[in-house]
Amino acid sequence: MGLHLGLIDYGMGNLHSVEKAFNRLGHQPSRVVNPSDLDGCDALVLPGVGSFDPAIDNLQSTGLIPDLKRWNEADRPLLGICLGLQLLFESSAEGRLEGLGLIKGHVERLPIGAGARIPHMGWAPLDLRRANPMLAAADPLAWVYFVHSYAAVPERPETLAAAASFGSSSVTAMVWQRRLGACQFHPEKSSDSGSAMLKRWLDWLQRGAPIG
């Protein structure tokens, strides 16, 4: 039996490009627009493009927030992408609403004095800090595509899975916490590197999403 992926549709995600990326890997995600759509899902993908507060507002309107928290408490796989990563944290300097709080920490604006233009837009190599279901230490250097003005700051250092350079600073590129992971970059727009990472995540799910 194949994996049943749920793609959370709350009106602010780049759903079409994410769907196409999974289609190329032989998977057809189902769109999740309300709690009943979670039935039968093996793993969830939370994409996102836009601003923090409108995204939280939209998620609240779907009624999915309590279910996403229960999903995480049950240690079930979830992958956040771009704004989807930021929503996993407790709060953001971009807005006033509470985040999902699935990962301890906050989202802050990229540093103005780092000698780089905001938004951070374009390709950058990943600095792997901890092997995870999307990226292993033996993998080739991964160049990935970013578009963002804010970056997460995890409270626990071990949550940081990969970083990227932003001028003279280093910012969060990936986080991982048991079966909950996320990337600030867009794997669906990151050519072969992004496709390889999504495939690795799918293979991990097929193996039962082992921890460690």
Curated annotation (Swiss-Prot):
Spell out the Pfam families in the cross-references: GATase
Biological process per Gene Ontology, one example term: L-histidine biosynthetic process
Q: What are the record keywords, sorted?
A: Amino-acid biosynthesis, Cytoplasm, Glutamine amidotransferase, Histidine biosynthesis, Hydrolase, Lyase
Supply one GO CC term from the record. cytoplasm
Where is this protein localized, as stated in its record?
Cytoplasm
Q: Is Cytoplasm a UniProt keyword of this protein?
A: yes
The UniProt entry annotates the active site at: 82 (nucleophile), 186, 188
Query: What is the catalytic activity of this protein?
Result: 5-[(5-phospho-1-deoxy-D-ribulos-1-ylimino)methylamino]-1-(5-phospho-beta-D-ribosyl)imidazole-4-carboxamide + L-glutamine = D-erythro-1-(imidazol-4-yl)glycerol 3-phosphate + 5-amino-1-(5-phospho-beta-D-ribosyl)imidazole-4-carboxamide + L-glutamate + H(+); L-glutamine + H2O = L-glutamate + NH4(+)
Query: What range(s) does the Glutamine amidotransferase type-1 domain occupy?
Result: 4-211
Q: What is its main location?
A: cytoplasm
Source taxon at top rank = Bacteria
Q: What is its EC number?
A: 4.3.2.10, 3.5.1.2
Q: Does the keyword Metal-binding apply?
A: no
In the record, what terms sit under GO molecular function? glutaminase activity; imidazoleglycerol-phosphate synthase activity; lyase activity
Pathway given in the UniProt record: Amino-acid biosynthesis; L-histidine biosynthesis; L-histidine from 5-phospho-alpha-D-ribose 1-diphosphate: step 5/9
PROSITE patterns reported in the protein's UniProt record: GATASE_TYPE_1 (PS51273)
Q: What does this protein do?
A: IGPS catalyzes the conversion of PRFAR and glutamine to IGP, AICAR and glutamate. The HisH subunit provides the glutamine amidotransferase activity that produces the ammonia necessary to HisF for the synthesis of IGP and AICAR.
Instruction: List the HAMAP family hit by this protein, alphabetically.
Output: HisH
Q: How does it assemble?
A: Heterodimer of HisH and HisF.
- State what protein this is by name: Imidazole glycerol phosphate synthase subunit HisH 2
Its taxonomic path starts at: Bacteria, Bacillati, Cyanobacteriota, Cyanophyceae, Synechococcales
